A protein has these predicted regions:
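N-terminal beta1-alpha1-beta2 submodule of the flavodoxin-like/Rossmannoid cofactor-binding fold
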Residues: 1-94, 101-103, 107-110, 114, ...
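Short, glycine-/small-residue-rich phosphate/pyrophosphate-handling segment
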Residues: 121-166
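Cofactor-binding loop segments of dinucleotide-utilizing enzymes, especially the Rossmann-like FAD-
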Residues: 8, 140, 177
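Short, well-ordered alpha-helix to beta-strand connector turns
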Residues: 87-88, 132, 169
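Hydrophobic/aromatic beta-strand patches that form the interior of the parallel beta-sheet core
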Residues: 4, 38-40, 136-138, 173-175
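Short, structured loop/turn "capping" segments at alpha-beta junctions
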Residues: 115-120, 170-171
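Glycine-rich, N-terminal phosphate-binding loop of Rossmann-like dinucleotide-binding domains
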Residues: 94-95, 139
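Glycine-rich phosphate/pyrophosphate-binding loop and the adjoining helix
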Residues: 147-219
Length: 219
């Protein structure tokens, strides 16, 4: 069983999303035997944003790239897709920045969203090719976006649900800590609530992974 763990917060010791992903991963290891993890810190070791030259490597080139830096970028793109496709569980730390996700996380998504690898176009419309995974997103936000007047400004969780759904990932679980910029008491209460929700999420993921393994054996 393979786990892909990504953090994207630009903060370190004070990062709420990093605290949550660490607890999620710890609980997953305790709940699932023989779980092998791959970790990427997308803020500490950022991935270059997509360019025309990098995107050209998503499909066969008339002739191989000769520039060493570009060759390395094409190889990285393949490595990122391979890591994602090989994973059974993906854990992503995704704080809300300016109503959306960190640019570091967007750079990773732009590398793995590749036609022919993680999705394809058919006569019946687009089809995701990365199904069967369990995705856990540790979401931290300064205000309240699940309800109320700020809900229409949520381009973070909505974006992640839509994007991974397009790639075929339907089992998306959120561990959510809101109100992190509303003062110490609301922030602490929201963090405690988020931490308390992790056990249920891990149990749900464990059941989902079991169903996925059973389907794979039948197929």
């Amino acid at each position: 069983m393979r786990l892909l763990h990504l953090d994207s917060s630009i903060l370190t010791d004070t990062s709420v999303s990093r605290q949550l992903t660490a607890q999620v991963v710890q609980d997953l290891h305790a709940a699932i035997d023989d779980l092998h993890a791959t970790y990427r810190d997308l803020a500490a070791v950022p991935i270059a944003h997509l360019s025309g030259a990098i995107a050209a490597g998503f499909r066969p080139l008339p002739q191989p790239a000769s520039d060493a830096a570009l060759v390395a970028e094409h190889a990285l793109s393949e490595q990122l897709v391979d890591e994602f496709l090989a994973s059974d569980i993906v854990v992503i730390g995704a704080p809300m920045y300016n109503f959306s996700v960190p640019t570091q996380l967007k750079a990773w998504i732009d590398r793995i969203a590749q036609p022919g690898r993680t999705f394809r176009y058919t006569a019946n419309g687009p089809e995701g090719l990365a199904g069967g995974k369990q995705l856990i997103v540790a979401s931290s936000r300064g205000g309240m976006y699940t309800q109320g007047p700020m809900a229409s400004l949520d381009f973070q969780e909505a974006y992640l649900t839509a994007t991974f759904g397009f790639l075929g990932v339907r089992d998306v679980h959120f561990v959510r800590a809101e109100n992190q910029s509303r003062g110490p008491e609301p922030a602490a209460a929201a963090l405690i609530s988020a931490q308390a929700s992790i056990a249920d999420v891990v149990r749900s993921v464990g059941r989902g992974v079991g169903r996925g393994v059973a389907r794979a054996r039948v197929e």
